[in-house]
From Swiss-Prot:
This is Large ribosomal subunit protein uL29. PANTHER family: 60S RIBOSOMAL PROTEIN L35/50S RIBOSOMAL PROTEIN L29, LARGE RIBOSOMAL SUBUNIT PROTEIN UL29C. Gene3D superfamilies: 1.10.287.310. GO terms for molecular function: structural constituent of ribosome. Belongs to the universal ribosomal protein uL29 family. InterPro entries: Ribosomal_protein_uL29, Ribosomal_uL29, Ribosomal_uL29_CS, Ribosomal_uL29_sf. Coiled coil: none annotated. It comes from the Bacteria. The lineage of its organism: Bacteria, Bacillati, Bacillota, Bacilli, Lactobacillales. GO terms for biological process: translation. The gene is rpmC. Disulfide bonds: none annotated. It holds the Pfam family Ribosomal_L29.
């Protein structure tokens, strides 16, 4: 998921995608522990997606605070 795709999403969509990504990360870690994970690069990709989503959520929060002031 690219940052440009994330910027256009609403807060609710971002929260839903964050939840889905965290669930996927949990499942990937479980597969890795069981020795069944084939694509280990997917772990870092999902972590980076979560970071991008959190960054955009934070940016939206800051923008909302600036709009109030």
């Amino acid at each position: 998921m690219k940052a440009s795709e994330i910027k256009g999403l609403s807060r609710d969509d971002l929260l839903k995608r964050e939840k889905d990504a965290k669930e996927e990360l949990f499942n990937l870690r479980f597969q890795q522990a069981a020795g069944q994970l084939e694509n280990t690069a997917r772990l870092s990709t999902v972590k980076k997606d979560i970071a991008r989503i959190k960054t955009e959520l934070w940016a939206q929060e800051i923008a909302a605070e600036k709009a109030k002031a």
